[in-house]
Amino acid sequence: RATDERINQAEQELRSELVVHVAVQGTADIGSVLGFTLLLKKVERIGDQAKNILELAEQGVSFADSSERERLFAERQELSALFAEAAELLNASDADDEAIAEYTDRANISVAYYQSKIDEFMTSERPGHEVVPLAIYYRFLRRIGANLVGIVRTSVDPLPHVDYLDDGATDTDD
């Protein structure tokens, strides 16, 4: 929990520095500052979801003996790859709109898959002690994936479309 407190403190300091920047430098950078603030919030959300997964494990939830263990491991690897690719896109010196669009499409496929698993478990005939933890786990994965997409998209388009999906619908996947 000490690490969590240090991270929260660092996030608060970053937000404070962004506010001070606007106060000192004026409003010329307000769009970028708001974009960075939104980006930081999405990163915080991913951290919160990761903590939620840890708390599942701390509460005794284990998929080690699950018949779905291999698939869960493969999905974890895929999500890890999305993290790595997001980092590459964020570290690129120039925004590559095509690469970002391809990333967004692939990540959204994963997000939709996670939702399909949630839907499947919600109507499953399997015992609740099996499917409830899986549904909760997939909900956390879905939110992590959606926020990864949000981070990458916010990095290139900080304000005009934040919290809206491509079709104009509101993105409520916090």
Task: List each language-model region with its residue ranges.
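Cytosolic, long alpha-helical scaffolding segments
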Residues: 1-174
